[in-house]
């Protein structure tokens, strides 16, 4: 009876005072939505875990827009190494210490083997060519792809790629010499580093090189992959966490995601078609795609094969490219590090052997330690790709339900004061003192990066050849090499350094020219 009377009253008010009624509705409906959403958001929190309270609708999104990984590290000093945040309505457990990461991602590796799906990347960017291995939820297809990638990236396979590493790293040194005019002209090395990573990825996957950064394919792939990397960010796309924003037909984010997807599909199709033509003519070179296609026992379909190729493409451009760019900026400002590296290299190779031995498997201990310290100090993927639990797990006496999203703050773990007494210092020698210390740059557990062996081998060869060929000198312009202050876009998935220029001065120009020829 009361409900009927209330409805009658509302109806009468709507008829007698339509403008007032519409105004009241326009105010009441959003308010009711916010109130109901707050109840939903509060009930979604994981019992037992502390964390910063957020704002209605958006949760903690506003607080992490500047630099999420560093903000998470700061919060860990207040709430402990594992706490929860909310991105929109989604509760997320953030892991910020090496010890906690070992328990959650090491001891519960299988339980944390899946990935969450985000609207922008999974539903828009990846709805045609599919996802990379690293961004795929757990499935039987993922297991097949991981097996295929592991076979292509294990130690014997990496050893078989030495020729390609030799060719591309030699071309890298040649470009530094060419575009730097023998040390006379300051250059931004980013394009040279990108060509190195891209050409190696294309060679391994499709059997084709990018011989010069002046090729049209170079510009297209590097631009598109850079934009797509931003769509994988866990903080840069508000519509991933606030569903109502997806209804906006004028969303520039969605339009840009679709554009990048279409452009990527175009060059993937071209690379696949050209390989098919070469295979039909019998002129193809051995590569991952061709090997799988010709392997009658392989159980990968075309979508799964593309997933492996996308993984190699994005992984090289993300990790190796960015790490080398950061490292050169540091070396230009730290001649003491260059001197130590040069002394160690010269115990094995003279300046008359600028390109060293491409088959050298990280035998120069100081250069190997330098690579590891660069990986730790810069942590180019500050937040490892997120995980989702596929079953309930218990941590610190608290039950974490199935379906919970986890962020591994690799930046905080690599800077853990419980592991290092001086985490903020750049010091390669720490890896002689603690050779078995954990490093989180490649992730941890079941979904750890499968390409770490190849990346380490490539980085070592690039470092030793560059440092034995050139003296890296700064210009008059300041280079910000600090991992926080020098980050060009803290909202991006990958921490990319701000642009800079340096001089690559040959140590022995006659020997270098002879070696490059």
Curated annotation (Swiss-Prot):
EC number(s) from the headed UniProt entry: 1.14.13.63
Pathway recorded for this protein: Aromatic compound metabolism; phenylacetate degradation
Cited Gene3D superfamilies: Cytochrome P450
Induction: Induced by phenylacetate and all its monohydroxy- and dihydroxy-derivatives. Induced by phenylalanine and tyrosine.
Reactions catalysed, as given in the entry: 3-hydroxyphenylacetate + NADH + O2 + H(+) = homogentisate + NAD(+) + H2O; 3-hydroxyphenylacetate + NADPH + O2 + H(+) = homogentisate + NADP(+) + H2O; 3,4-dihydroxyphenylacetate + NADH + O2 + H(+) = 2,4,5-trihydroxyphenylacetate + NAD(+) + H2O; 3,4-dihydroxyphenylacetate + NADPH + O2 + H(+) = 2,4,5-trihydroxyphenylacetate + NADP(+) + H2O
GO MF annotation terms: 3-hydroxyphenylacetate 6-hydroxylase activity; heme binding; iron ion binding
Organism superkingdom: Eukaryota
Purpose of the protein: Catalyzes the hydroxylation of 3-hydroxyphenylacetate and 3,4-dihydroxyphenylacetate to 2,5-dihydroxyphenylacetate (homogentisate) and 2,4,5-trihydroxyphenylacetate, respectively. Both of these compounds are used as substrate by homogentisate dioxygenase in the homogentisate pathway. The homogentisate pathway is used to catabolize phenylacetate and use it as a carbon source. Can also catalyze the hydroxylation of phenylacetate to 2-hydroxyphenylacetate at low efficiency to compensate for loss of phacA.
Similarity field: Belongs to the cytochrome P450 family.
Name of the featured protein: 3-hydroxyphenylacetate 6-hydroxylase
Species of provenance: Emericella nidulans
Lineage: Eukaryota, Fungi, Dikarya, Ascomycota, Pezizomycotina
């Amino acid at each position: 009876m009361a409900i009927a009377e209330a409805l009658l009253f509302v109806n009468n008010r709507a008829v007698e005072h339509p403008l007032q009624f519409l105004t009241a509705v326009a105010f009441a409906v959003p308010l009711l939505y916010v109130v109901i959403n707050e109840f939903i958001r509060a009930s979604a929190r994981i019992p037992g875990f502390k964390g910063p309270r957020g704002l209605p609708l958006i949760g903690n999104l506003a607080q992490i827009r500047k630099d999420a990984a560093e903000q998470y590290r700061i919060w860990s000093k207040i709430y402990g190494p594992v706490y929860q945040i909310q991105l929109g309505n989604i509760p997320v457990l953030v892991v910020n210490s090496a010890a906690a990461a070992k328990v959650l991602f090491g001891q519960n590796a299988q339980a944390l083997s899946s990935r969450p799906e985000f609207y922008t990347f999974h539903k828009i960017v990846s709805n045609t060519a599919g996802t990379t291995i690293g961004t795929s939820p757990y499935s039987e297809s993922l297991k097949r792809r991981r097996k295929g990638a592991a076979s292509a990236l294990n130690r014997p396979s990496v050893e078989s790629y030495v020729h390609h590493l030799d060719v591309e790293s030699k071309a890298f040194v040649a470009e530094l010499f060419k575009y730097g005019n023998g040390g006379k002209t300051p250059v931004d090395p980013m394009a040279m580093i990108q060509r190195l990573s891209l050409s190696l990825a294309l060679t391994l996957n499709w059997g084709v090189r990018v011989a010069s950064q002046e090729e049209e394919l170079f510009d297209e792939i590097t631009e598109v992959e850079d934009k797509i990397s931003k769509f994988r960010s866990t903080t840069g796309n508000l519509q991933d966490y606030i569903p109502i924003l997806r209804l906006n037909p004028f969303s520039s984010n969605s339009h840009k995601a679709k554009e990048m997807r279409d452009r990527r599909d175009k060059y993937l199709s071209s690379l696949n078609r050209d390989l098919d033509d070469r295979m039909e003519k019998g002129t193809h070179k051995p590569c991952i795609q061709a090997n799988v296609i010709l392997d009658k026992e392989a159980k990968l379909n075309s979508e799964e094969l593309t997933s492996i190729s996308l993984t190699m493409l994005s992984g090289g451009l993300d990790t190796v490219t960015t790490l080398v760019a950061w490292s050169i900026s540091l070396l230009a400002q730290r001649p003491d590090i260059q001197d130590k590296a040069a002394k160690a290299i010269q115990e094995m190779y003279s300046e008359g052997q600028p390109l060293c031995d491409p088959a050298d498997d990280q035998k120069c201990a100081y250069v190997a330690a330098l690579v590891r310290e660069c990986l730790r100090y810069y942590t180019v993927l500050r937040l490892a790709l997120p995980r989702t639990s596929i079953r309930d797990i218990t941590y610190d006496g608290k039950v974490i339900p199935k379906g919970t999203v986890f962020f591994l703050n690799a930046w905080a773990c690599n800077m853990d004061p419980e592991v290092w007494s001086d985490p903020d210092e750049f010091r390669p020698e720490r890896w002689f003192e603690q050779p078995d210390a954990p490093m989180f740059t490649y992730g941890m557990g079941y979904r750890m990066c499968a390409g770490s062996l190849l990346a380490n081998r490539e980085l070592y060869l690039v470092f030793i050849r560059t440092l034995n060929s050139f003296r890296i000198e700064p210009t008059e312009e300041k280079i910000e090499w600090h991992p926080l202050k020098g980050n060009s876009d803290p909202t991006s998935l990958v921490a990319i350094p701000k642009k800079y220029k340096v001089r690559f001065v040959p140590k022995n120009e006659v020997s270098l020219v002879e070696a490059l020829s």
